[in-house]
Amino acid sequence: MKIRGLLYAVVLIMGASTSAAETLLQRGDYLGNGIVACGNCHTPQTPSGPAPGMEMAGQFLVEEKGLFKAFAPNITQDKKTGIGGWTDQQIITAIREGKSPDGTIIGPPMPIGLYRGLSDRDVRAIVAYLRQVKPVNNEMEKSTYQIPLPPAYGPPVTNVPDIPQTDKIAYGAYLAGPAGHCIECHTPFVKGRPDFANQLGAGGFPFHGPWGVSVSANITPMPMALPIMATLNWPRSYAPASDRTAPG
C-alpha cells in the first residue's frame, strides 16, 4: 500500500511538473486549435473542410436579417490585410475588450462578453499561437450592424488569474464559457445578443454555410437553462456588461 501510494504521489508530481513546463506556444496551440477553435470562424470553409492554405484568413460568417451581417476578419500575420502589424497588447485588447487598434468596436458574433474572462496567461498564449500563423493576403469585407454597438464592453480587463485545473467545476465552467464559448453558439440570440439570462445553452442558433443551414442543439439537461444558470451564476460571471444586471 505504501509503495502504491508513493507511486500515485510521483504520478501527481510528474503531472503537475508537466503542466507547469508547458510553454506559452504549446498552450496557445492547444487553445487555438482546440477548445477556443479560432479557425472555426476565421478559416474559410468548403464543403469538404477548411480551405487549404487559408488558415485564419477570414470568411463570411452569418447574416441575421435586420441585425447584422458578420465577416470573420483575416487574423494571419499578413501586415496589410491581417494583424501582422498589430502589437501583442493590441491583439489582446481586441480579443478581451472588443476594440480594434483604430478604436472600432467589434460586434457579434465575436463572444467578447465571454472572452473578457480569459486568463492573462491564456490570452498571451493565444497571441503566441497567432504569431506563428503564416501570413495570407486576403482582404475581407467589414461586418455591418443595424443594431447599436456599445461604446465599450466594460472597463479595461486586467489581472485575470488562471482557474486551477484541479477545481473541476470551476475549470469546466471556464472551458465552456470564456475559453470554449460553447454557450455562445448554444444559446438563442435575442435582439442580436445571446440570451444568457433566460435561455443559457438552450440551442436554436442557426449556422449558414456551404452545407446549408444547421441549428445549434440544446445542451442543457432540461428544456431551459435556468437550473444551470442558477448553479453557475453565468450572467454575472461571463455575460456582456450590458447583461450583467440580469437576474441570476
Model-predicted segments: where are they?
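Positively charged n-region of N-terminal signal peptides that target proteins for export
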Residues: 1-5
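Extended, well-folded interaction surfaces typified by the phenylalanyl-tRNA synthetase beta subunit core
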Residues: 137-149
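Ligand-binding pocket scaffold of soluble enzyme catalytic domains
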Residues: 23-25, 88, 122, 129-133, ...
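Detector for the c-type heme attachment site
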Residues: 41-47, 96, 111, 131-132, ...
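The canonical Cys-X-X-Cys-His
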Residues: 28, 35-45, 91, 126, ...
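Electrostatic cytochrome c docking/interface patches
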Residues: 17-33, 48, 150-177
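Electron-transfer interface patches adjacent to heme c in soluble/periplasmic c-type cytochromes
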Residues: 58-92, 113-123, 198-244
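Bacterial N-terminal signal peptides
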Residues: 7-16
